[in-house]
Amino acid sequence: MVMTDPIADMLTRIRNANMVRHEKLEIPASKLKREIAEILKREGFIRDVEFVEDSKQGIIRVFLKYGQNNERVITGLKRISKPGLRVYAKSNEVPRVLNGLGIAIISTSQGVLTDKEARAKQAGGEVLAYVW
């Protein structure tokens, strides 16, 4: 079966594993998913990420992060630009998520960036997801 939206699948897998407090999860790899996982790690939403090469496309292993008393670090993930309705933002219209408490993941001509990085580089692009 062909997957129509692999980014939504990745976010759903992370959301579901986070809800049941799994320590790690595995996601089929792609270049875009790797970049999104690296952003989540860099911004402190996940503990670690590793890339496992296999005979097919590879696997991204995501290690989820929890706070004291096993509370979730990721409270929400939302796919914004979908295959049926793409959402773009100009460089001066890059969205803020919860007044800066969350991040927007944006695919720009300069690579996949957070909303803060896109504002600093004055780059617009496709708004992939919100994470808070």
From Swiss-Prot:
Disulfide feature: none
**Family matches, as InterPro entries:** Ribosomal_uS8, Ribosomal_uS8_CS, Ribosomal_uS8_sf
Could you list this entry's UniProt keywords, alphabetically sorted.
Ribonucleoprotein, Ribosomal protein, RNA-binding, rRNA-binding
- One BP annotation, GO: translation
Q: One Pfam family, please name it.
A: Ribosomal_S8
Q: Which GO terms describe its cellular component?
A: cytosolic small ribosomal subunit
Q: Single GO molecular-function term?
A: structural constituent of ribosome
Function according to Swiss-Prot or TrEMBL = One of the primary rRNA binding proteins, it binds directly to 16S rRNA central domain where it helps coordinate assembly of the platform of the 30S subunit.
The record describes its quaternary structure and partners as: Part of the 30S ribosomal subunit. Contacts proteins S5 and S12.
Q: NCBIfam families, per this entry?
A: PRK00136.1
Q: Which family does it belong to?
A: Belongs to the universal ribosomal protein uS8 family.
Q: What is this protein called?
A: Small ribosomal subunit protein uS8
